[in-house]
């Protein structure tokens, strides 16, 4: 298992405002839990399966 920022189909992080959104997202991705990381407003997941993609595309338009 690993911790990290999950990415979508375009390999961009999930932007967020609420911890509940990220916790649900992370659990859907088979993680243990998650929260909205305040410095960059992106979901951070704890306990994701090792094969979950957490490598972000450098061309993503993100809030950070």
Swiss-Prot record:
Organism domain of life: Eukaryota
Cysteine disulfide partners in this protein: 12-60, 16-36, 22-43, 26-45
One cellular component term from this protein's GO annotations in UniProt: extracellular region
Record's keyword terms, sorted: Disulfide bond, Ion channel impairing toxin, Neurotoxin, Secreted, Toxin, Voltage-gated sodium channel impairing toxin
Keyword Lipid biosynthesis listed: no
Tissue: Expressed by the venom gland.
InterPro entries: LCN-type_CS_alpha_beta_dom, Scorpion_toxin-like, Scorpion_toxin-like_sf, Scorpion_toxinL, Scorpion_toxinL/defensin
Keyword 4Fe-4S: no
Domain LCN-type CS-alpha/beta: 2-61
MF GO annotations: sodium channel inhibitor activity; toxin activity
SMART domains linked to this entry: Knot1 (SM00505)
A Gene Ontology biological process term: defense response
Subcellular location: Secreted
General function of this protein: Beta toxins bind at site-4 of sodium channels and shift the voltage of activation toward more negative potentials thereby affecting sodium channel activation and promoting spontaneous and repetitive firing. Has a selective effect toward Nav1.7/SCN9A which plays a role in pain mechanisms, and especially in the development of inflammatory pain. Shows no lethality toward mice.
Comment text on domains: Has the structural arrangement of an alpha-helix connected to antiparallel beta-sheets by disulfide bonds (CS-alpha/beta).
Family per record: Belongs to the long (4 C-C) scorpion toxin superfamily. Sodium channel inhibitor family. Alpha subfamily.
Note: The protein sequence seems to be related to the alpha-toxins, however experimental data show that it has a clear beta-toxin activity.
Name of the protein in its database record: Beta-toxin CeII8
Organism: Centruroides elegans (Bark scorpion)
